[in-house]
């Protein structure tokens, strides 16, 4: 058996995407002037956008309170432009803005990509915003957007500089940072119908997006991401990257999951009819410009929104609407890097909603409200109130989080005890509220409204509402479990009968508070149970499972979702059931804090589910999606190690350590050989091989120490193996081969990544040797992607490959640094590169000896 190991020159690993085509270089970037005239439309040339989706970014994060106001947007003097350029016969329009941010302890709160040495979009040397970090200065200010191009940092021109120069300018900008940015004007779409005839290559295009897998933040739509050469779409010529798929034959693709969209497209006949939304540039003149709510209080612009039968918005106007739930139909390669940690955005609920809050730069429609309609329509339980709104802002990187006064329709209940009807559309975060109650017939109450969720955006529910029924199911005497089940199984459109009962809820809340205090006091005095913050102020753990807060009906308050491998800072572990925690990012703790299930709760629920599996399923039965039959979908993606049924993976205590070597890399699972080969091929100066040992005699053309380390005797190598000097060894043709700890250390201490083609057992052996590897497990989603990525596989071979991967996860799951999944080899490859970059150090999280 041969044991290959690869090494790489240590640098700051950058993020890459394959480039399909480049556009011509843009030589007409305007220079900002200090002369500011009245607002004017500025037309600036833009090149064709390439397929580059992701290069590398520099992350700066900050938490600012309060924010300092910055000047009004700067409009470039159009006299400085001689002519109005065109792109393929189309005028491309930009707007320019000056944004002032105050740097906090952690930075500015955004990521960048691009530069003259590594263009982000085609040949454009600009520095582009690829990510707005929630809770940072940029997110709190609310004006900086993904895909903005930074032209100047304070007085430093960064319009045509290298990436490192831009990073340096941002680092040295001081505590008050003025950014001059350029962005495209808003985009609408035109709906067209396309008829395609399937050929040998099928329809010939790739898609991304869907509920729970958003391609554009806040948007559940399905987008075209690639046109395949020689396919039906390319031959037809009308479908393009960035188009939004609305319908396939008679099936709507609105609010469907990615898997549902794929299934609909696969189950089509030879002739396929597509309804497609194509982006169309529009020019917003001043009368329709978004209000500047950052600097001043704007008069209300009331929008009259009606809910059509298909759930879409209808505007009482002849102007085409802008979908409120979307930023823009720009393809993802214009929105910057993929963000695997970004939480899903909520879907807007528009039913029974008379007026919305004023438009913001993210959500704008120049439509006036028909006030006569409002006055004439009978709504017996509501009256209009123009009150300041501080809770309706969606917490996204494009939202305006500077809580300036704005006008919204506020619901007031004229008769406190009268039931009312509320209709919500489920989003990716569920319905956006929590419930309590259900004991001793006390009723089910709304205890928490998720900011930006469907309930919040509808304005129809509030804390203290009693839920009387859900889709006709009476909940007045229901238990908590019955109410949770009714809400979870209610479908996409949920009709709720609610009744505002503030006094009943206050009595219930007081009782819960007393019970919780008693439990906390008992827990603190008992000396047993989970680790407590009075015993240990700072507790860090690594999540060993996926947790989706939107699927956990038992949450006592706002939850915190996380993925396998995430580092969590547990702030309060004094409760046996729930812990308070923050997710730890590369820049420190994130601003978002929420509750997570305790170790005890996770393990108890998993054991209960394992008993159900043993009762309902045949031993060892795992379906083609990797799911164990009988498991409930409650947000806990926990795992049990094979052969160790008492060992349930929940949280692993970790400690932060600085390392002075470059971490080895072990990739396990299907396609690992192709990933290793691609890393070496694309980065030959960063990834290579280390030298294995063997007892085989040296051949004439071989050099000791270059081709192999030739061991003098078999006895000596067997002795070294017994003394744990090898991470893995085996026998081939009566000769021993192996990879020694010293060989790996030799590579690591010289600043090179060492990719090891070894089994999962080697991970633990490297950890014992104080060489903590980056262990990446490629987990197949199902048989179909395996067969798609390797056309030579038969279904039987794919099934065996899939089963081996599942067993591999069961055996070594506790040692993985990260688990990656993807539908294509390119997607998996890019995720692996991202993990390697993020986990390279010099500060890493390693297992601690602490016991939870």
From Swiss-Prot:
One GO BP annotation of this record: sensory perception of pain
Record-annotated Guanylate kinase-like domain positions: 662-837
Residues with a covalently attached lipid (S-palmitoyl cysteine): 5, 7
Post-translational modification: Palmitoylation of isoform 1 and isoform 2 is not required for targeting to postsynaptic density.
Matching Gene3D superfamilies: 2.30.42.10, Guanylate Kinase phosphate binding domain, P-loop containing nucleotide triphosphate hydrolases, SH3 Domains
Pfam name, any one: SH3_1
Protein name: Disks large homolog 2
Organism: Mus musculus (Mouse)
């Amino acid at each position: 058996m041969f044991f290959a190991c690869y090494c790489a020159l240590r640098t700051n690993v950058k993020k890459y995407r394959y480039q399909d085509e480049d556009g011509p270089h843009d030589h007409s970037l305007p220079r900002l002037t200090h002369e500011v005239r009245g607002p004017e439309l500025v037309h600036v040339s833009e090149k064709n956008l390439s397929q580059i989706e992701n290069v590398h970014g520099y992350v700066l994060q900050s938490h600012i309170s309060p924010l300092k106001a910055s000047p009004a947007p700067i409009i470039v003097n159009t006299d400085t432009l001689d002519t109005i350029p065109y792109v393929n016969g189309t005028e491309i329009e930009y707007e320019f803005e000056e944004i002032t941010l105050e740097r906090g302890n952690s930075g500015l709160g955004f990521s960048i990509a691009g530069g003259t040495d590594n263009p982000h979009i085609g040949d454009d040397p600009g520095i582009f915003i690829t990510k707005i970090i929630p809770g940072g200065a940029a997110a709190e200010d609310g004006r900086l957007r993904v895909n903005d191009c930074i032209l100047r940092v304070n007085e430093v021109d960064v319009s045509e500089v290298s990436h490192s120069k831009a990073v340096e300018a941002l680092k040295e900008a001081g505590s008050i940072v003025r950014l001059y940015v350029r962005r495209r004007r808003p985009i609408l779409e035109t709906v067209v119908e396309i008829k395609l005839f399937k050929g040998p290559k099928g329809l010939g295009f790739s898609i991304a997006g869907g509920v729970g897998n958003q391609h554009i933040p806040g948007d559940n739509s399905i987008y075209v991401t690639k046109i395949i050469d020689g396919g039906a779409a390319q031959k037809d010529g009308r479908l393009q990257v960035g188009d939004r798929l609305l319908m396939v034959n008679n099936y709507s693709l609105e609010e469907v999951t990615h898997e549902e969209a794929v299934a609909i497209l696969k189950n089509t006949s030879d002739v396929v009819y597509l309804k497609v939304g194509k982006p169309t540039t529009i020019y917003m003149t001043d009368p329709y410009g978004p209000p500047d709510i950052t600097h001043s209080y704007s008069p209300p612009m009331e929008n009259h929104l009606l809910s059509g039968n298909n759930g879409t918005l209808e505007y009482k106007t002849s102007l085409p609407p802008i979908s409120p739930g979307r930023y823009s139909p720009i393809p993802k390669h214009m929105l910057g890097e993929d963000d695997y940690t970004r939480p899903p955005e909520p879907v807007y609920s528009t039913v029974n909603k008379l007026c919305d809050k004023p438009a913001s730069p993210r959500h704008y429609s120049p439509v006036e409200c028909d006030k006569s309609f409002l006055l004439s329509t009978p709504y017996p339980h509501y009256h209009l109130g123009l009150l300041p709104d501080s809770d309706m802002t969606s917490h996204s990187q494009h939202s305006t989080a500077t809580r300036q006064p704005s006008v919204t329709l506020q619901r007031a209940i004229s008769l406190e005890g009268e039931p009312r009807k509320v209709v919500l559309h489920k989003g990716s975060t569920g319905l956006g509220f929590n419930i309590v109650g259900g004991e001793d017939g006390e009723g089910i109450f709304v205890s928490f409204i998720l900011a930006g969720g469907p309930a919040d955006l509808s304005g129809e529910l509030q804390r203290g509402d009693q839920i009387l029924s859900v889709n006709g199911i009476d909940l007045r005497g229901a238990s908590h479990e019955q109410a949770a089940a009714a809400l979870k199984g209610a479908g996409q459109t949920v009709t709720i009968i609610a009744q505002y009962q503030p006094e009943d809820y206050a009595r219930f809340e007081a009782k819960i508070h007393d019970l919780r205090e008693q439990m906390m006091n008992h827990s603190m005095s008992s000396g047993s149970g989970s680790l407590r913050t009075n015993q240990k102020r700072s507790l860090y753990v690594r999540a060993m499972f996926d947790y989706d807060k939107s699927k956990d009906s038992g949450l006592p308050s706002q939850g915190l979702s996380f993925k396998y491998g995430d580092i969590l800072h547990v702030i309060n572990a004094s409760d046996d059931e729930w812990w308070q925690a923050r997710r730890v990012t590369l820049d420190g703790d994130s601003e978002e804090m929420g509750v997570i299930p305790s170790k005890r709760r996770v393990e108890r629920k998993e054991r209960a589910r394992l008993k159900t599996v043993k009762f309902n399923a045949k031993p060892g039965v795992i379906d083609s999606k990797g799911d164990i039959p009988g498991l409930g979908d409650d947000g806990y993606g926990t795992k049990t190690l094979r052969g160790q049924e008492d060992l349930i993976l929940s949280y692993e205590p970790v400690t932060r350590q600085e390392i002075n070597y470059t971490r080895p890399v072990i990739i396990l699972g299907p396609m690992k050989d192709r990933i290793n080969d691609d890393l070496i091929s694309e980065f030959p100066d960063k990834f290579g091989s280390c030298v294995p040992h063997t007892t085989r005699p040296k051949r004439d053309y071989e050099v000791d120490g270059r081709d192999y380390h030739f061991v003098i005797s078999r006895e000596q190598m067997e002795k070294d193996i017994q003394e744990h000097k090898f991470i893995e060894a085996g026998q081939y043709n009566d000769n021993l081969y192996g990879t020694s700890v010293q060989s790996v250390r030799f590579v690591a201490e010289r600043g090179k990544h060492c990719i090891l083609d070894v089994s999962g057992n080697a991970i633990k052996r490297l950890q014992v040797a104080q060489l903590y590897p980056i262990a990446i497990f490629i987990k197949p989603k199902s048989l179909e992607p395996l067969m798609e990525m390797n056309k030579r596989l038969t279904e039987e071979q794919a099934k065996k490959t899939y089963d081996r991967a599942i067993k591999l996860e069961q055996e070594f799951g506790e040692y993985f640094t990260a688990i990656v999944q993807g539908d294509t080899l390119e997607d998996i490859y890019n995720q692996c590169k991202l993990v390697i970059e993020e986990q390279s150090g010099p500060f890493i999280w390693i297992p601690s000896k602490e016991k939870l």
